[in-house]
């Protein structure tokens, strides 16, 4: 049986471990890749203090097998988004051994329901090509209204 929980500070070590695993997979990094301590610390600070929710999927062995995060932001209200409340979905990941079991979909459903409770009018996300079909199957659509300026 898989349990789905909202992460708290007590889950921080498992949460960071899961995030680093996901980043290695998505970025094709070797298993022994060592993340910069500043990067890990910044991730911890984000999870501790940010306006976000992270759902963890935990198996019977008490191991995180999936995670998904929703970051909440407020913008100036517009006609199409009268509450000004938006969200950005990130870090959706299921361990390869547990894929195709509905875990990502369940985590996404939990986060979408919370977003609705918070009066969010739009959820955006960045996706890999591999994930695109999954998000489309969950009702997400390509957007032509977004542009990005990279400030790095």
What residue spans do the PLM features occupy?
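A short beta-loop-alpha structural element at the N-terminal edge
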Residues: 3-17
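Conserved GNAT-fold acetyl-CoA-binding loop/helix
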Residues: 23-43
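Conserved GNAT acetyl-CoA-binding A-motif
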Residues: 108, 115-127
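Conserved acetyl-CoA-binding loop of GNAT-fold acetyltransferases
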Residues: 6, 120, 136-146
